[in-house]
């Protein structure tokens, strides 16, 4: 049954249901938990999910250094998959019990200009609840539903492109002028 479940859910086209969220240089894709769960239940009415709870019956674990983490389990037939997800802010920074700051490169007029400080707010129960439901959707992806959305998630984040230097810009302008001359095209310099 497991292979049949995966094949069925993996081949379900979710493209029209993907929501995109851009923060900084990162664009993330999401599926609505309500839609994802409804699609699974339509096909597998016996499917069940569980939000794992820990000390004091809390639906998360917390570490002062790394932040909050939530866990879900989904069972379809005789197969259970567990999934976990850190509680993150809109810029994908781990949220903790207390606010904290971090440094990022500051760019001024296309040039690196030291560092600037950004902050991360403390997690709220709303943040934790939102993450639990995103964790559920990620858990459903382990059964095939929208799995391709997570392709590349495990790759390291690339650095943002560095702005071109004046030397590079002038070199490109000279090359454009040279090519225009070779092609016999009038080229008007923009200043």
Where are these regions (language model features)?
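Amphipathic, non-membrane alpha-helical rod segments
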Residues: 187-191
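Polyanion-binding surfaces on beta-sheet-dominated domains and ring/shell assemblies
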Residues: 1-174, 178, 185
